[in-house]
Structure formats: C-alpha cells, structure tokens
C-alpha cells in the first residue's frame, strides 16, 4: 500500500509520478524500496486518471463505512446468542450429572 500512497501523495502535491519520485517518497518515509514494485506501479498508473479513480473509490467506500455499525451489532447479537446456548448446554450437562451422582 505504501507504493500507492506515495503515488497519491505525489499526485496531490502536483509532482510527476515517476520511478525517481516514488522512490524518494518511500525512502523519506523509511520504507524499503523494491525497484520491481516501483516499476510495476508506474506501468500500472500509466493510463489511469488518478483524480477520477480517487473520486470513484471515495464514493464506493462511503456506503461500506455506513454498513459497518450494522455488522458490529449483528456480531454482538451473535455473541450473546452463543453465550446463551453455552449456558443452556452447561445447565443440561449439570442436570445429567445429577442422574449419575
């Protein structure tokens, strides 16, 4: 992801997105630079309108962020149901123990 972030930073500041600039940003951030990944990034971004891609991604991410609280509530409800089931199983096991006790 740091390679993408470097490209986005360069784009936002109006700098040219090329191998040298991406390497400089990554090195300044203290990241290890893999020349092959830098070249692949530059090649992949060659025909991409970064501004359009950022807008499209921001719009697509908004609904996902809104759905996150609902998912958290569902997970919490499932955890409560599991606890109730475990308690019922423990009570049933205790009752069976009385038969042999």
Curated annotation (Swiss-Prot):
GO CC, alphabetical: ribonucleoprotein complex; ribosome
GO BP annotations, alphabetical order: translational elongation
Role description: Forms part of the ribosomal stalk, playing a central role in the interaction of the ribosome with GTP-bound translation factors.
UniProt key word Ribonucleoprotein: yes
Biased composition (Low complexity): 61-72
MF terms in GO: structural constituent of ribosome
Subunit structure, interactors included: Part of the 50S ribosomal subunit. Homodimer, it forms part of the ribosomal stalk which helps the ribosome interact with GTP-bound translation factors. Forms a heptameric uL10/P0(P1)2(P1)2(P1)2 complex, where uL10/P0 forms an elongated spine to which the P1 dimers bind in a sequential fashion.
A Pfam family matched in the record: Ribosomal_60s
Gene3D superfamilies tied to this protein: 1.10.10.1410
Keyword Ribonucleoprotein: yes
Family designation: Belongs to the eukaryotic ribosomal protein P1/P2 family.
Protein's UniProt name: Large ribosomal subunit protein P1
Region (Disordered): 61-101
Organism per entry: Methanothermobacter thermautotrophicus (strain ATCC 29096 / DSM 1053 / JCM 10044 / NBRC 100330 / Delta H) (Methanobacterium thermoautotrophicum)
The organism's place on the tree of life at top rank: Archaea
The organism's taxonomic lineage, starting at the top: Archaea, Methanobacteriati, Methanobacteriota, Methanomada group, Methanobacteria
Cross-referenced InterPro entries: P1/P2_N_sf (IPR038716), Ribosomal_P1/P2 (IPR027534), Ribosomal_P1_arc (IPR022295)
Keywords: Ribonucleoprotein, Ribosomal protein
């Amino acid at each position: 992801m740091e390679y993408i972030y470097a490209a986005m930073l360069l784009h936002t500041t109006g700098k040219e997105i090329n191998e040298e600039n991406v390497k400089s940003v990554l090195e300044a951030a203290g990241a290890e630079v893999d020349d092959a990944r830098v070249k692949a990034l530059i090649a992949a971004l060659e025909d991409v309108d970064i501004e359009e891609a950022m807008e499209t991604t921001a719009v697509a991410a908004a609904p996902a962020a809104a759905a996150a609280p609902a998912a958290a509530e569902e997970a919490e409800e499932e955890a409560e149901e599991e606890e109730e089931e475990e308690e019922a199983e423990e009570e049933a096991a205790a009752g069976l123990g009385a038969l042999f006790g």
